């Protein structure tokens, strides 16, 4: 776990400090694999599992060699490859600073692939789009990296990319449905952990109350393995923070204010995750 935490810290610093690394995050081969093998659900599953198993096996083979340096380098390369593909903070800042017209539309378009619909210039839509982008670009990757190592990070990234690409390449409906279910199921535990972190660093009652209200609506349940609850919970948490921020009510329809608070909230959530990982490392050493 200590090496995993170190790899995550290095990856986050490099991804933020060296923007050119973003251009190395290429999965152009995935479309060819999906066209060749994704015609059936079994083939689509193979497209996800085969590369992930190979990467996981490579990581296992490198573990313990040269005091873990080889594994660390391999894990770092895998994280830099699977995070993103765009940097979250840069896109949030661009959206915050964008004027009206084409610049704003382009900034909103950066979040289109992270959401089922094109986000609109409204507080709720922007916060929902931003939290989905955070989940899919960063937190789900980190969750499965901590859980399963480099193979887990790649498995999630391939599942999400394949689910996004399936309509464009004309995959069968059954294959597309499988890919969407797998991607959603992999995102669900990461989304739930994000909500718990938000409850700790934001308005506890607003966050958990919104979580209960969303799941208590007809047709929804706690075991649906569906991360669709995340935008509603993020909006509730951000609204509560904005209203309490200066000791008086603030307009929660102010897109810029909500976007700024979302950026701060995501930083605090990341800090909670890293602190939790550090505590697990310390617990392992003490044991």
State what each model feature region is.
Residues 1-287:
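Hydrophobic N-terminal alpha-helices or hydrophobic patches in metabolic proteins across all domains
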């Amino acid at each position: 776990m200590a090496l995993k935490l170190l790899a995550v810290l290095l990856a986050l610093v490099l991804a933020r400090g060296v923007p050119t690394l973003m251009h190395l995050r290429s999965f152009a081969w995935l479309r060819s694999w999906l066209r060749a093998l994704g015609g059936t659900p079994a083939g689509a599953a193979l497209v996800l599992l085969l590369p992930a198993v190979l990467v996981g096996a490579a990581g296992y083979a490198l573990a313990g060699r040269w005091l873990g340096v080889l594994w660390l380098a391999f894990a770092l390369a895998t994280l830099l490859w699977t995070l993103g593909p765009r940097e979250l903070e840069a896109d949030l800042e661009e959206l915050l600073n964008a004027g009206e017209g084409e610049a704003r539309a382009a900034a909103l378009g950066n979040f289109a692939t992270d959401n089922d619909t094109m986000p609109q210039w409204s507080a709720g839509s922007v916060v929902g789009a931003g939290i989905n982008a955070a989940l899919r670009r960063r937190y789900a990757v980190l969750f499965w990296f901590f859980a399963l190592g480099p193979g887990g990070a790649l498995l999630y990234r391939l599942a999400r990319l394949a689910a996004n690409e399936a309509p464009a390449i004309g995959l069968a409906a059954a294959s597309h449905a499988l890919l969407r279910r797998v991607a959603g199921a992999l995102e669900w535990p990461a989304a739930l952990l994000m909500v718990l972190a938000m409850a700790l660093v934001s308005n506890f009652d607003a966050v958990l109350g919104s979580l209960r209200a969303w799941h208590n609506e007809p047709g929804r349940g706690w075991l649906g393995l569906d991360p669709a609850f995340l935008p509603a919970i993020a909006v509730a948490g951000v609204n509560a923070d904005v209203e309490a921020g200066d000791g008086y009510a603030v307009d929660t329809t102010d897109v810029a204010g909500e976007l700024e608070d979302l950026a701060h909230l995501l930083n605090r959530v990341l800090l909670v995750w890293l602190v939790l990982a550090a505590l697990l490392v310390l617990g392992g050493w003490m044991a």
